[in-house]
């Protein structure tokens, strides 16, 4: 017998250890590992980790397999791995119905089980008896399956199993938005069964998606049918959310040692080296101990203070577990592997030494990794006094197979039997290394020869759609539909991918299908999806952002390819817009916004672009893999004909109808404006919302409070005849001039008569009028509706058409058929259709009011009448592109969203919702105000864009109150344009999508801005720096004279601090580390009272300082304050209190502190100082009041208009300085709190 080499002898030693400690427990039938000798439950996660040592040892044997004996051992170890992975696969395939159902519901009760019987692979607990939804476990299985397959093992045997694996990919691809129970199976750390978004689950899912992409599950023997496909955008969504969360684990766990498996082996899910370093350092500094690392702060599992008789904890008892949490040697194993992959030998040796000191030696001398170490019951008091001082004892399983397996892997790496590349054949560890710059390829295609020739005049040479053949160009929705066929399997009852939107990463590739090649245009350029695609300026802005995104996110083979089609609808007065020409020239130059680009034709980029094979569209199940699925063939044939054809627009002017002389002319002017609910006239934003929703539903037109100031005792719904003189509509502020400017109407068409309903209204002797818009209540006769239809045919003015259609919708309904006109109120013998009583026609077909609205919507899009576009889009139920995705993008980055106007109708969105529910929630919040409902959806999309590209804008903001943001935007326009609230609201709703996005950016960033032109729909937002205009919107700049006039007004800085506080309050922005500092204040007092809500000291027992749940509690209390500027003064008062606690001025702050009392005391001190120095406030709040002024003050109205009885001049004071708000807050704290010294000089250095 040949002698063994030293390495062979050493491997035999590890083989014996692996067999004795791990393989001896493997069930012979299923291949699964039971939890222990007395517990037959097999967890997916634990089982996968257990087999890693076996896999690693098999690869070590393969390298030295020079004898049959070694080759046999290698094969036995490999087949043990295959046995386990197939055992888990069979257990999950038995629950294939759950995989299918979960794609639709994403409910925890429809998820795959987290554990199975090790004896037969069947479920062991019911759906509702365990926290089964653990996305990290399924993701870990897929990740290791990919790595093992890449290493040469064949685990998947049939195409049915391939289909199931493909559907497991769909199961985890939305991990970034699905709360689960996480790596420790408990969700919220109180263990009450509340799932939450976990960074460890998202990271593992991201790693699995990237590992499975384009992987052939049959290895070298596979073909196109055995390849797994993943849409790159889904993995990137996980990456973006993961990066925004780290180093936080979840809402209730501010840090978790489980993240070590995400930033290192096996996931390598983070591409940012600095973020990896920061996360590791945070774990080591706060969770590392002598015996390993704590799982997370205040983890009560197996501590002596835990009550083992119940699964959950009371919230107040979490504080008991602080500093006595169990420490887990498992995490030293992770740290050894982490540093081994970093090639840091010194750190590997350090943690290996620490680990060996705490391992348990068995009777035969084998080192065992215990599950955890706990403080003994009798030493808990000493550990509280001096954390880390007491000797701990082993609790739980020993050996802990999960940890033992990773320990053996670490030893194999340390002794050189394995290279790190063998444990990571897919090279995931290289993700954080610097990558070469990406060159983005751009192709512009003309819709027809005429557009091509127009571009050629500008020295821009492109091809037409016909000329790029045989390459076919299709919109993104076609690609989305094709992917619904991926993973379908009739035998298993699997329906494939749920139809979802596809992102820019997916459309930036070419796709091959048999002998055809497809290029897809980006989703944002799809005009059929939503109106913002009709705004050329916004499309250019989005294009630049997407090109910049590709630069940072692209990691596929080949270069990204962006394909755009220039259509007739993009033309402006039959000319190509200058903005488009300028952008194309920038693209041609080779750089745009710092990104390297190449402009060319599709055939030029065939060899350099990424190409994906759509072979899954074959009829594989029917035995014809080379033949397209019949449904796919039909779909593609249809789409080739109609994908880029122009849609006809409804002709509102019935060509067959002869206009007849009307007995009287009616005007529905202002019908759309009556639905508006934006209120900006009150100086105190957030105080006066619209009328309560219930009232507004019963009565669609309710005069707002300011109407009571109107001197007229009678209010008309419609404009009167010229003889009777003008009368304000209910929503008018008496500014008819502005309304006429906004709605220019031909005087010939403005003559109108009072209809019967208006006559009825005029008889009522009431200043407030409730007017019903339900069809059952209408007093209109059909003849009058006929006259409205005739007016609709005659008028060329789209605004007037909109008012008429709004009135028809209110009185007749969207589906009112105009064919019925003229019959009901005529005698039967005269009930014959003729040219005078027929309805609106298009090509001989009678149309409904809905059809007329569609035509109006399309015309408004073409003419860029954005206020009308938004309103008609809302009436037609149009959806903003990616609304649910946009809200999800905000929520998963820990930003809650509220919709509706404060304070009455705000609805908070705290979890991702389906699109239908979201739209219903928004429309419930705004009632009949379709314009603002659509604007809310639009702003949500822009907010999501900003949080993806400029997340720093949202730092220290937990809740985005969209309704309040809309009010502030209108208020800012009112301030800048020096106009009243109604005019500002109209200007806001008439902003183009590009300028709306630009204005929102200025609000978020706090930058000063001005408006360079005031033409409707042509407002241009101009950034201002100091008193000079430094930056403008890239498109649509105003005239120089207007800008000069604006610059002159910017010099006056009065009101800047009030504006800043108002903006910060509306955006719920707070100082850095604000919430954790408030926690320290709450720890030293009995409570903090804010606007009637008390934050109890017990919150510090339930939550840690950095816990997101605590921040949300404070935020909820602050949101009780309706005025944003007053809210910011309360925040400043809280910051002064934090300074008191941080400098340890007093051991305790006493009882409940009424924070608002501090603010009002500061205001009183401010007014006293103002009287002494004869400051500005002596003109209002600081002057001696006469009787009338005292009465006004008693009724809550200050002369200066300050909110919440606080002088406007205090709001407009800088925080610092001797007359700064923080100085007065400090003095107020010293006076109000009993614990602060009252005597002696107070030196305050407030920053």
UniProtKB/Swiss-Prot annotation:
It is found in: Cell membrane. Residues 853-883, 1052-1089 are annotated as: Calmodulin-binding. The modification Phosphoserine is found at residues 1030, 1033. Transmembrane segments: none annotated. It is a lipid-anchor. Although the final Cys may be farnesylated, the terminal tripeptide is probably not removed, and the C-terminus is not methylated. One of its GO terms (cellular component) is plasma membrane. One of its GO terms (biological process) is positive regulation of glycogen catabolic process. Signal peptide: none annotated. Keywords: Calmodulin-binding, Carbohydrate metabolism, Cell membrane, Glycogen metabolism, Lipoprotein, Membrane, Phosphoprotein, Prenylation. Pathway: Glycan biosynthesis; glycogen metabolism. It comes from the Eukaryota. PANTHER family: PHOSPHORYLASE B KINASE REGULATORY SUBUNIT, PHOSPHORYLASE B KINASE REGULATORY SUBUNIT ALPHA-RELATED. Belongs to the phosphorylase b kinase regulatory chain family. Phosphorylase b kinase catalyzes the phosphorylation of serine in certain substrates, including troponin I. The alpha chain may bind calmodulin. This is Probable phosphorylase b kinase regulatory subunit alpha. It comes from Drosophila melanogaster. The lineage of its organism: Eukaryota, Metazoa, Ecdysozoa, Arthropoda, Hexapoda.
